[in-house]
C-alpha cells in the first residue's frame, strides 16, 4: 500500500516536469531516425587518383573499371606519382594507383605487370580496406583466370542476406535508449530531491528501503517499455526492420538492461551530493560501458585486458542477445548464456542499490 502512494508521488513529479515528458517521447524517435545513418561503418567514397604511364586500351579499361566502382570516388588522372602524392598530402585523395609503362605489353606476353597501390593510412581502416578493394580490381584485370575462378565460386550469405548494416546496428541502439531513460533519469531523481531538501522528509518516515528503491525504479521501467515500443515502431516504419525472433524476447532483454542501468543510477545518486557530481560519475561509467561493449568495434579485436571487461559488461551481453533476436531469430537456447549473465549482474547491482540507500537521522 505504501508503494502505491510512493509511485503516485513519482508520477506526479514526472508530470510536473515540462521537459521530461517531451524528452521521453522524442529521444527514442530521434535516436532511431538519425543514428543508423550516422553509425554506418561501411567504407565508401574512397577518393582515388590514377597515374597511367602506359596510355593503352588495357590501362584505360582498368581506369574505367576503378571509376565505375561504387566504393570509389574517381578524382581523375594525375600526370605523375609526385603530383598524385601531393594530393594525398593535402587530403584530397585517399589512394593512388600507378599503372606502369608497358602494362598492356606485359599482359600480351603473359607476364604479370607490377601495379602500385598507395593508400593514405591516416585513417587506418579506410586505407586498409581501400587498398584491398583496389587490389581485387587490379587482380581481376591482370589475371582473367581469377575472374573465371570467382564465377565458379558460389557463396551463400546467412541471415542478413542483403548485408544491410542497419539490421546489424539498430538492435544495439536499444541499449543506448535504455542508457538514458533508465540510467540518467533515475540518477538525477534522488539528487534533485537532495538539493531541494525533500529527501529529508522521506528519511523520517517508516518507509522501508526496498519500497523506496522500487518506487524510484518502477516508473522508469515502464518508461523503458514505452521507449522500446517506440523504437520498434520506428525500426518497422522507417527501415522495414522487425525482429525475426519472438518480440517478447526484445522486451525481456530490455527490462534486464533497464534494471541494471536504473540500479546503477540509484547507486550513484545515493552516493552523490550534487547534480553535477552525479552527472559526471554516471558519464564515466556510461562511456566505459558503451565503448567496451562491442557496439562500435568487435570485442575480439580488443586487447586482452580490455576484452576481459566484456565478461562483466551487461551491454555486451545485451547487444549479442538483441542481434540474435533481430537477425537470426534465436530462441532461449541460443541466448541462454547472455540472459543468465544479465540476471546475475542485475541481481548484484539491485542488491547494491538497496544497500546504498541509508536514511540519515
Give short role names for the model-derived ranges.
Residues 82, 158-163, 242, 294-349, ...:
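Membrane-interfacial helix-loop-helix junctions in multi-pass membrane proteins
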Amino acid at each position: 500500500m505504501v508503494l502505491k502512494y510512493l509511485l503516485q508521488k513519482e508520477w506526479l513529479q514526472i508530470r510536473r516536469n515540462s521537459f521530461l515528458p517531451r524528452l521521453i517521447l522524442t529521444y527514442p524517435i530521434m535516436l532511431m531516425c538519425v543514428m543508423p545513418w550516422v553509425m554506418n561503418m561501411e567504407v565508401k567514397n574512397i577518393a582515388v587518383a590514377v597515374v597511367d604511364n602506359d596510355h593503352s586500351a588495357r590501362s584505360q579499361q582498368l581506369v574505367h573499371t576503378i571509376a565505375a566502382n561504387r566504393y570509389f570516388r574517381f578524382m581523375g588522372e594525375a600526370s605523375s606519382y609526385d603530383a598524385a602524392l601531393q594530393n594525398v598530402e593535402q587530403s584530397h585523395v585517399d589512394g593512388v594507383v600507378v599503372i606502369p609503362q608497358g602494362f598492356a605489353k606485359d599482359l600480351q606476353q603473359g607476364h604479370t605487370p607490377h601495379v602500385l597501390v598507395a593508400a593514405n593510412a591516416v585513417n587506418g581502416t579506410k586505407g586498409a580496406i581501400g587498398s584491398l578493394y583496389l587490389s581485387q580490381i587490379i587482380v581481376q584485370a591482370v589475371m582473367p583466370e581469377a575472374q573465371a575462378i570467382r564465377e565458379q565460386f558460389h557463396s551463400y550469405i546467412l541471415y542478413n542476406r542483403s548485408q544491410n548494416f542497419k539490421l546489424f546496428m539498430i538492435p544495439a541502439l536499444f541499449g543506448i535508449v535504455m542508457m538514458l531513460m533508465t540510467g540518467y533519469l533515475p540518477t538525477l531523481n534522488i539528487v534533485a530531491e537532495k538539493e531541494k531538501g525533500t529527501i529529508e522528509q522521506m528519511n523520517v518516515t517508516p518507509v522501508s528501503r526496498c519500497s523506496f528503491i522500487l518506487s524510484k525504479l518502477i516508473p522508469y521501467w515502464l518508461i523503458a517499455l514505452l521507449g522500446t515500443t517506440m523504437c520498434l515502431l520506428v525500426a518497422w516504419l522507417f527501415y522495414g526492420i522487425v525482429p525475426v525472433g519472438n518480440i517478447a524476447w526484445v522486451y525481456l532483454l530490455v527490462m534486464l538492461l533497464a534494471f541494471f542501468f536504473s540500479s546503477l543510477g540509484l547507486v550513484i545518486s545515493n552516493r552523490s551530493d550534487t547534480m553535477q557530481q552525479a552527472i559526471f560519475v554516471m558519464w564515466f561509467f556510461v562511456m566505459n560501458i558503451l565503448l567496451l561493449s562491442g557496439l562500435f568495434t568487435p570485442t575480439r579485436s580488443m586487447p586482452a585486458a580490455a576484452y576481459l571487461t566484456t565478461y562483466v559488461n551487461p551491454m555486451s551481453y545485451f547487444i549479442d542477445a538483441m542481434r540474435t533476436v533481430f537477425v537470426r531469430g534465436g530462441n532461449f537456447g541460443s541466448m541462454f548464456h547472455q540472459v543468465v549473465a544479465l540476471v546475475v549482474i542485475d541481481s548484484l547491482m539491485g542488491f547494491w542499490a538497496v544497500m546504498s540507500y541509508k536514511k540519515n537521522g
